[in-house]
From Swiss-Prot:
Keywords noted in UniProt: Hydrolase, Plasmid
Family: Belongs to the acylphosphatase family.
InterPro entries (UniProt xref): Acylphosphatase, Acylphosphatase-like_dom, Acylphosphatase-like_dom_sf, Acylphosphatase_CS
Gene that encodes the chain: acyP
Enzyme Commission numbers on file: 3.6.1.7
NCBIfam families, sorted: PRK14432.1 (NF011006)
Active site: residue positions: 18, 36
GO-annotated molecular function: acylphosphatase activity
Domain of life the protein comes from: Bacteria
Protein's name in the database: Acylphosphatase
Length: 93
């Protein structure tokens, strides 16, 4: 299993980006979460089964939804000891 963390900056809050991310992740059967951060970015943690899933997810994130404007995506690989497990993908408020 591959565990990735993303920090997305740009016009990503108040434009349905979290809902878009949740839809993409659920369609791909990913597990994890998406949430707004106080600094205006969005954080995503996602668990993938294959590297191909990672590439597809990242390509969809780069485009965002029609109301968002993605300026930057920071990516971090989480190690196997990441303390949280997820049964699905959800939005944290």
């Amino acid at each position: 299993m591959y565990k990735q963390q993303y920090f997305i900056s740009g016009k990503v809050q108040g434009v349905g980006f979290r809902f878009f991310t949740e839809q993409v992740a659920n369609n791909m059967k990913l597990k994890g979460f998406v949430k707004n951060l106080n600094d205006g970015r969005v954080e995503i943690v996602a668990f993938f089964n294959t590297k191909e899933q990672i590439k597809k997810f990242e390509n969809l994130l780069k485009n965002g939804n029609r109301y968002s404007n993605i300026e930057n995506i920071e990516k971090k690989t989480l190690d196997e000891k990441y303390p949280f497990q997820f049964n699905n993908f959800k939005i944290y408020y």
